[in-house]
Structures are given as structure tokens and as C-alpha cells.
């Protein structure tokens, strides 16, 4: 237990070092010291803890002139060679696939508009998260369901100009849809003059009074089958899973804006792997954070440990202009100010011709262009400029 006298000493020492460490580390250090229980601390112990923290923090900083770009490229690229090239099933869910390993890492740094396996993890509000039935109800509401998802067979009668729909009883129950609900939706469609007659409990026939061509009848068939019954566009499948003490919904497909409007969803905890969607809905800072998390997640799933600072550098470079740009000739590399650096990467002749036509000037400020012409690069000891005063005697 820390007494009031020691608390005063802790605050005094922490105020003395406020300029030596970041604010967040300062807050965390104070909280960590105050949380120490079961040990009687002295002022000397407090001094040792604070001095050790400052020393460790200062040792974690890079040296001036460090080639952080090359170190990051090696630190992320080398583990990338150890990655698998497969798509895995999502843990415990047979129906959902998730791209992992090198293919997912390539997707992220290429800034692909849509991931190959878009997914969301949806957390629920307190009222819904502990009740499985309520969670299932939300899952049914967000899963995008069309008429074709619940029919077992469709038959077209060209003599009577009618379409008969036979519905799958199990699918209706699974999706939480009723026949009456489907009838109401079909009658609201612009199908012209129609008449609906029941055949049995799970089947009805739609008669078209004013259609006289087979092509028009088949167009109506497609229109009916593609009609939305309910759900959020882009969500192909929604599955409820137990996670600790609460139920969460895992989806195949992603629609962040649509899901945020669903009652019962905790909008502060929604997760998606679609980076461009996050940028459109929440902004570039949120997208930057997601890039870092997704890269870290991919590496950790493969059992690879990479310093977070390397990963953050990649996400910073990809988002520094306010838009998400890929690491490649159509993004970061292709937009370098140096003509020689652009030419050294890809399509050399095109870059040189374009630069000559525009009258661009090479400043030789970067690494690649200086290596090309054989002069020292401005990194490490090369960043230091010294002038020696000769002995005039």
C-alpha cells in the first residue's frame, strides 16, 4: 500500500521527468507504480523504477541517420518469405473462409479496394449480447436474403404465363422469413397486373395478366428471384459465435455503414478487414490504425514477431497524403520526387522520357539516386556534415 507521503514523492519525481518521456508513457508509468500491491516501496525503489523506465525508453529510440526504411523493408519482408500461401477456414466455422499469410499481406500493402474474403466481427449492446436468441435475430436481420436464397425450385409455365415458386421449409426457418412476408414484397414490385394463388403451405403461383412474350416472362422470373427480402447489402452470411461471456456475429462480407444503422449493434466495437470501407466511413486515421492492426494480425497468426514500429511506418507511408496508397508503382514508389528512383523501380524508359519531356530536375536527396551515380548517401555517418579548419601555421 502506498501512503500519502510516498504518493507526494512519486508525483514530484514524475513531474521532474515530464519532458523526458511521452505523455502516454508518463501516465502509464504513474498508473503502474500506483497499482503495485503487496510490496512496501521506498523512495529509493521509486527512483530505481523511474530511472530504469527512462533508460529503457531512451534505448528504444533510433539513432539520428538510421536507415529506417531499409530496416523496415527487411523486418517485414524477411518474415514474409516464411508465410503460407493458403486460404484457411475461419476457426470453428465451416462456411467461412479467411485469407491469411502472404496473400493477405499482399492485399494490404497493395491497398486492394475489396479484400478477397471481406469479414466483420460485430459486437452487440448489453441488451442483446448475452441472449443467444436475440443475437440470432440480429444475425437474421443483417444477412442479405433474396427470394432465390429460400426457394427450392422455380417453374415457368409459358402456356398460362405464370411462375410457380416452391419454398424450402428449412431455409425459411433458418433465415427467419415467412411466406406472407415474401408475398407482400412481390406485390409491391413493378410487375404489372398479377394474381397470386396458393398451391400449398410452402408454394404459390404468380399469374401475369398482361404479359404475352416468353422473354418478358423470364425477365420477371429473374426480377423476382433477385428481389431483396431483408438484410444489409454485401453481407452474404452471418453466424453467431460465443466469445467469452457474450455472443458476437461473424459475417461473410462487409458493409460498415449499413451495419452501424442496425439496432442492437455496438457501433463502438465493430471490426472489419475492409480498409477502404473504414476510410470512407470513419476517415484516414481509422484506416491507418486498421492497416497496422491487420499487418500485425497476419504476422502473429504465422507465429512471426515484428516490432510494431516497423508496421506503423508502413501504415504511415501508405496514408500520409490523406488517401490510402499502395506500396508500388501506382502508389508510394511511383510518386517519388526523384526521377532516377522512379526509373530504378519499374518501366525505366517511360519514367526517363516523361521526366525529360516535363523538364524535371534531379535533386539527389534520396538513397537510390545517390547510389546510382556513386556518391555517398545521406544516411548514417553520411548525414553528418563536418568542416575542418586547417592549421594555418
UniProtKB/Swiss-Prot annotation:
GO terms for cellular component: cytoplasm; DNA-directed RNA polymerase complex. Keywords: Cytoplasm, DNA-binding, DNA-directed RNA polymerase, Nucleotidyltransferase, Transcription, Transferase. One of its GO terms (molecular function) is DNA-directed RNA polymerase activity. It comes from the Archaea. GO terms for biological process: DNA-templated transcription. Its EC number is 2.7.7.6. The keyword Thylakoid does not apply. It is an enzyme of class 2 (transferase). It is found in: Cytoplasm. Pfam families: RNA_pol_Rpb1_5 (PF04998). DNA-dependent RNA polymerase (RNAP) catalyzes the transcription of DNA into RNA using the four ribonucleoside triphosphates as substrates. Forms part of the jaw domain. Reconstitution experiments show this subunit is required for basic activity. Belongs to the RNA polymerase beta' chain family. This is DNA-directed RNA polymerase subunit Rpo1C. The gene is rpo1C.
Amino acid at each position: 500500500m502506498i501512503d500519502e507521503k510516498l504518493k507526494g514523492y512519486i508525483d514530484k519525481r514524475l513531474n521532474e521527468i515530464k519532458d523526458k518521456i511521452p505523455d502516454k508513457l508518463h501516465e502509464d508509468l504513474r498508473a503502474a507504480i500506483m497499482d503495485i500491491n503487496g510490496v512496501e516501496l521506498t523512495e529509493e525503489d521509486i527512483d530505481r523504477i523511474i530511472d530504469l523506465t527512462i533508460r529503457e525508453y531512451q534505448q528504444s529510440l533510433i539513432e539520428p541517420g538510421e536507415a529506417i526504411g531499409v530496416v523496415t523493408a527487411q523486418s517485414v519482408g524477411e518474415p514474409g518469405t516464411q508465410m503460407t500461401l493458403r486460404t484457411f477456414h475461419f476457426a470453428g466455422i465451416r462456411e467461412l473462409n479467411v485469407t491469411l499469410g502472404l496473400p493477405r499481406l499482399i492485399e494490404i500493402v497493395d491497398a486492394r479496394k475489396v479484400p478477397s474474403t471481406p469479414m466483420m466481427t460485430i459486437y452487440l449492446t448489453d441488451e442483446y449480447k448475452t441472449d443467444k436468441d436475440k443475437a440470432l435475430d440480429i444475425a437474421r436481420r443483417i444477412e442479405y436474403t433474396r427470394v432465390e436464397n429460400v426457394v427450392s425450385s422455380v417453374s415457368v409455365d409459358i402456356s398460362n404465363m405464370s411462375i410457380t415458386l416452391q419454398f424450402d421449409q428449412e431455409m425459411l426457418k433458418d433465415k427467419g422469413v415467412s411466406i406472407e412476408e415474401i408475398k407482400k414484397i412481390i406485390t409491391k414490385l413493378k410487375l404489372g397486373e398479377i394474381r397470386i394463388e396458393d398451391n400449398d403451405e410452402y408454394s404459390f403461383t404468380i399469374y401475369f395478366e398482361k404479359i404475352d412474350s416468353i422473354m418478358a416472362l423470364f425477365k420477371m422470373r429473374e426480377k423476382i428471384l433477385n428481389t431483396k427480402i431483408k438484410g444489409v447489402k454485401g453481407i452474404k452470411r452471418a453466424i453467431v459465435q460465443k466469445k467469452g461471456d457474450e455472443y458476437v456475429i461473424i459475417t461473410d462480407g462487409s458493409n460498415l455503414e449499413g451495419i452501424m444503422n442496425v439496432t442492437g449493434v455496438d457501433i463502438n466495437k465493430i471490426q472489419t478487414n475492409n480498409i477502404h470501407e473504414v476510410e470512407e466511413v470513419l476517415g484516414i486515421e481509422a484506416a491507418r490504425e486498421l492497416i497496422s492492426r491487420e499487418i500485425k494480425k497476419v504476422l502473429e497468426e504465422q507465429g512471426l514477431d515484428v516490432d510494431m514500429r516497423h508496421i506503423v511506418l508502413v501504415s504511415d507511408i501508405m496514408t500520409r497524403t490523406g488517401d490510402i496508397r499502395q506500396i508500388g508503382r501506382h502508389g508510394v514508389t511511383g510518386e517519388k520526387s526523384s526521377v532516377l528512383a522512379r526509373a530504378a523501380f519499374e518501366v525505366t524508359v517511360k519514367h526517363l522520357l516523361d521526366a525529360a519531356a516535363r523538364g524535371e530536375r534531379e535533386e539527389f536527396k534520396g538513397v537510390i539516386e545517390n547510389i546510382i551515380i556513386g556518391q555517398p548517401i545521406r544516411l548514417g555517418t553520411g548525414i553528418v556534415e563536418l568542416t575542418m579548419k586547417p592549421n594555418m601555421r
